[in-house]
Amino acid sequence: MPFLCVNVDHVATIRQARLGIEPDPVTAAAMCELAGAVGIIMHLREDRRHVQDRDIELISKTIQTEFHFEMAATEEMQQIALRIDPATVCLVPEKREELTTEGGLNCIGQEKRLTEYLAPLHEKGIGSSLFIDADADQIKAAKAIGAEYVEIHTGHFADAPTRSEQKAELTRIIDGIKMSQDLGLKVNLGHGLNYVNILDFADVPGICEYSIGHSIMSRAIYVGIDRAVRDMVEIIRNFAD
């Protein structure tokens, strides 16, 4: 059975709108755990636009499930990851002008650099994931780099303007999942997934985790974090193993 990991970055976004102390993403993370999430995700961006260093320090010390740390492949983030010792790091691309991550990491041509970058993290027992598009060459590069997981970017699927385009993206993602699995990579999915479009993956076997943040926190405004997380956990619980 696949599992749910909740991204609490959007709680930090609301807090930073007033540069205050609430809502606290650390408190939100604990509530997500109590509601059934098996992992908490935070992305510490280089510009610190939402999550702050204080947040990841506290999360790493307080959560009872797994902490998945999203980060750019910079020296600063590598040192932070080595210090806080998350369950996994997920390398993602960053552009300062983007509102949110717009696409997958380009691994092609970076195999040597990223292999060397991840080496000290692997030596410490930290798992690794690469956030990539469902592209055959990217998947092959991820395998060459030695990542344990790939998180396949589902944003183009989620944002497709028509059902036919969405189906085409779905096919591309499913092909990417199968190829990743054939190469021995574990597969997570994330970006833009919500309570409706996630149903398209109900019969797709072998997905380890779904990484979901925005849609859960959006629903939480109306029904609360506990109910919003439990609703998503219940949907995923019925998916293929």
UniProtKB/Swiss-Prot annotation:
1-deoxy-D-xylulose 5-phosphate binds at residues 9-10, 45, 50, 100. It comes from Maridesulfovibrio salexigens (strain ATCC 14822 / DSM 2638 / NCIMB 8403 / VKM B-1763). 3-amino-2-oxopropyl phosphate binds at residues 7, 18, 192, 213-214. GO terms for molecular function: pyridoxine 5'-phosphate synthase activity. Its main location: cytoplasm. It catalyses: 3-amino-2-oxopropyl phosphate + 1-deoxy-D-xylulose 5-phosphate = pyridoxine 5'-phosphate + phosphate + 2 H2O + H(+). InterPro entries: Aldolase_TIM, PyrdxlP_synth_PdxJ, Pyridoxine-5'_phos_synth. GO terms for biological process: pyridoxine biosynthetic process. The gene is pdxJ. Catalyzes the complicated ring closure reaction between the two acyclic compounds 1-deoxy-D-xylulose-5-phosphate (DXP) and 3-amino-2-oxopropyl phosphate (1-amino-acetone-3-phosphate or AAP) to form pyridoxine 5'-phosphate (PNP) and inorganic phosphate. Homooctamer; tetramer of dimers. This is Pyridoxine 5'-phosphate synthase. Gene3D superfamilies: Aldolase class I (3.20.20.70).
